[in-house]
Design a protein with these regions (language model features):
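Conserved acetyl-CoA-binding loop-helix of GNAT-fold acetyltransferases
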Residues: 83, 89-102, 122, 126
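Conserved GNAT acetyl-CoA-binding A-motif
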Residues: 103-115
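Conserved acetyl-CoA-binding loop of GNAT-fold acetyltransferases
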Residues: 125-134
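A short helix-loop-beta-strand connector motif used in the catalytic cores of GNAT acetyltransferases and
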Residues: 43-55, 77
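Conserved beta-strand in the GNAT
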Residues: 55, 62-70, 77-82
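A short beta-loop-alpha structural element at the N-terminal edge
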Residues: 2-16
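Short glycine/proline-centered loop/turn elements that form peptide/ligand docking sites
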Residues: 97, 116-120, 136-143
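Conserved GNAT-fold acetyl-CoA-binding loop/helix
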Residues: 16-44
């Protein structure tokens, strides 16, 4: 397995990964209209152009995980950390999560995650992120905003 920068040609495969990674949970929770499930290919291309996206490939060159990030005023936003279900619990998400932070210089990192899905929330806590805001976005849907401030090195 290897981590690489994704290219614009990867967008259709990344969108397929997104459906496979988030689809089962969205369906289970009754969120058929959740953004990861309803995003058009055109919008996916737009989003791609505004972020740095990393992908992790299996030995056959298939994308099995991804994350995207964008730094504004020293603040790194990370989103869409996703791994194919059959590759979870192998440290792939952790590798991507740490690599995007290493790659993009920042003094604060932030993200949002769904409060109703505990595994990602618990992972982010273990990685040193702390909640700072909740937002109800729909029936049974609450986003938790989390951040991690980076100390300046002396």
């Amino acid at each position: 397995m290897r981590i690489e920068l994704a290219t614009i040609q990867d967008v259709p495969e990344l969108q397929e990964l997104q459906h496979k990674a988030f689809g089962p949970q969205c369906i289970e929770l009754g969120w058929k209209d959740a953004p990861p499930m309803t995003e058009s290919l055109e919008h996916a291309y737009e989003e791609f152009s505004q972020c740095t996206t990393l992908k992790i490939l299996d030995d056959e060159g298939r994308i099995i995980g991804s994350i995207r990030g964008n730094v504004t005023d020293g603040s790194l936003y990370m989103g869409r950390l996703m791994v194919l279900p059959e590759y979870r619990q192998q440290g792939i998400g952790k590798q991507l999560f740490r690599e995007i932070q290493r790659l993009l210089p920042h003094n604060r990192a932030w993200l949002c995650t769904c409060k109703q899905v505990p595994a990602p929330y618990e992972f982010y806590l273990r990685e040193g992120f702390r909640p700072y805001k909740d937002e109800i976005v729909g029936p049974g849907q609450t986003w938790v905003y989390m951040e991690k401030k980076i100390r300046e090195r002396l």
